[in-house]
A protein has these predicted regions:
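Repeat-blade elements of multi-bladed beta-propeller folds
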Residues: 11-39, 63-82, 92-118
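A short beta-strand motif characteristic of beta-propeller blades
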Residues: 8-13, 48-51, 86-92
Length: 123
C-alpha cells in the first residue's frame, strides 16, 4: 500500500505468488487476486493476511515425473526434450485458476474472475 499524496510505501508484504491485479479496499481490508489461484484479504494498514480463498482449479496437483528414459511427463503429455517443460509449466500456471482480474466489492460480496472460466462471488 502507498500513501496517495506522497507515493511512499506504507505496507510492503511478501505474497505467495505474483499479484498482477489492483486490490479492492473496503472497511480497512485490501482484497487482491494472486497468480497461484488464491484471493487474499489483508489488513490494509499492516498487510497481515486475514483470510484467503483458493479456486478449485488451482488445487489440481500435476506433479512432474522424470521417467526412466529421461522424459518429463504429466497426465496425457510426454516430452522428449526437457526444454519443452518450462513452456508447459507456464501454460499450466495460467490455465489452473490464476486470478489476473481486480476484485470488486459490492453489498458485502467480493466478485472476481479466474482463468478457470468462472466468476466467483464470496460473502
Amino acid at each position: 500500500m502507498a500513501d496517495a499524496a506522497t507515493g511512499k510505501s506504507l505496507v510492503r508484504q511478501q505474497g505467495k505468488a505474483y499479484m498482477f491485479s489492483s486490490p479492492a479496499i473496503a472497511g480497512g481490508v485490501a482484497i487482491i487476486g494472486v497468480l497461484n489461484g488464491t484471493l487474499e484479504a489483508r489488513d490494509a494498514n499492516t498487510g497481515e493476511l486475514l483470510w484467503d480463498y483458493q479456486t478449485d482449479a488451482s488445487k489440481q496437483n500435476s506433479g512432474w515425473v522424470l521417467t526412466a528414459d529421461h522424459r518429463f511427463n504429466q497426465p496425457l503429455l510426454f516430452f522428449d526434450n526437457w526444454r519443452e517443460a518450462p513452456l508447459l509449466a507456464q501454460d499450466r500456471q495460467v490455465s489452473v485458476g490464476s486470478i489476473f482480474s481486480s476484485p470488486l466489492i459490492a453489498n458485502g460480496v467480493v466478485y472476481f474472475g479466474s482463468t478457470d472460466g468462472f466468476l466467483y462471488a464470496l460473502e
